A protein has these predicted regions:
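Compositionally biased low-complexity segments at domain edges in trafficked proteins
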Residues: 87-111
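Beta-strand-dominated extracellular/periplasmic modules and repeats
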Residues: 1-88, 94-96
C-alpha cells in the first residue's frame, strides 16, 4: 500500500479492536484534516499526506466510558496526542495504537 496514512487502534486490556474511537488528524499547517471514528476493526484511513509534521489525537477517555469501563475522575488518560513527521510521500505511514485506560504504545507500523 504505497503512500498515505492509516491508523489501527487496539484495546490490549480487553483484547478488542477500538471500534468507534474518535480520532482527529491535523496537517502540517495545523488544519483539521480528519475528525472521525475508527471502523469496526479499529481502523481509520487518513488522507494522502504532504511532507511535514502531523498530529493525531486519540480520545481514549470518552471511548472507555462509552464501553462501560469505570474510570477515575479525572481519568488517567483522557486524550493521547501523537506528533509524527512525514518525509517520503512514496512510503505508507501506519500508526498502530495499543492502549489500556492506564497506558499506551504508539509506533510506526509496517502495514
Amino acid at each position: 500500500m504505497p503512500g498515505g496514512i492509516s491508523i489501527h487502534v487496539y484495546d490490549v486490556s480487553r483484547g478488542v479492536p477500538a471500534a468507534g474511537l474518535r480520532v482527529e488528524l491535523r496537517g502540517p499547517d495545523g488544519k483539521l484534516l480528519v475528525d472521525a471514528q475508527t471502523a469496526k476493526p479499529g481502523t481509520l484511513e487518513g488522507p494522502t499526506p504532504l511532507t511535514g509534521a502531523y498530529e493525531a489525537v486519540f480520545h481514549v477517555g470518552d471511548w472507555y466510558r462509552a464501553q462501560g469501563v469505570a474510570l477515575p475522575t479525572p481519568a488517567f488518560l483522557e486524550v493521547v496526542p501523537y506528533r509524527f513527521g512525514i518525509a517520503d510521500l512514496a512510503q505508507h505511514y501506519h500508526l498502530p495504537l495499543k492502549m489500556t485506560p492506564w497506558g499506551f504504545s504508539l509506533f510506526r507500523g509496517g502495514a
